[in-house]
Swiss-Prot record:
Protein name: Small ribosomal subunit protein uS11
Any one GO MF annotation of this record: rRNA binding
Subunit structure: Part of the 30S ribosomal subunit. Interacts with proteins S7 and S18. Binds to IF-3.
PROSITE patterns: RIBOSOMAL_S11 (PS00054)
Gene label: rpsK
Length: 133
């Protein structure tokens, strides 16, 4: 009986809503998916969403519309914790780069800086084979 009460107390604990006025939005746009994670300036994740989490699967995950829906979902949950102003860090060359930024602005977040942090190899790994259609 004591174990059940201890477990009940653990499950009652919830995340406390913090009032975070500014943060950083990391958008990773690959050819297969788009992942949007919103952090505070220290790097602790406030909310995140991806095209797969929002409900798209297969080739629809790589669309620009799926990235828009994912960015709006992440922005909505972050704004509940008091987020107003964000910096945007873009990574990757997928279809959802610009549409994710537009969705953040339309959700009501103020975008102060947009940075492109796409990793560019200085002749590192061998690229995948070319498609022959």
């Amino acid at each position: 009986m004591v174990k059940n009460q201890a477990q009940a107390k653990k499950s009652v604990k919830r995340k406390q809503l913090k009032n975070i006025p500014s943060g950083v939005v990391h958008v990773k746009a690959t050819f297969n998916n788009t992942i949007v994670s919103i952090t505070d300036p220290a790097g602790n994740v406030i909310s995140w969403a991806s095209a797969g989490k929002v409900g798209y699967s297969g080739s629809r995950k790589s669309s620009a519309f799926a990235a828009t829906v994912a960015a709006q979902d992440a922005a909505k949950t972050a704004m509940n914790s008091g987020l107003k102003e964000v910096e945007v860090c873009l990574k990757g060359t997928g279809a959802g780069r610009e549409s994710a930024v537009r969705a953040l602005i339309s959700a009501g977040l103020v975008v102060s800086v947009i940075r492109d942090e796409t990793p560019v190899p200085h002749n590192g790994c061998r690229p995948r084979k070319r498609r022959r259609v």
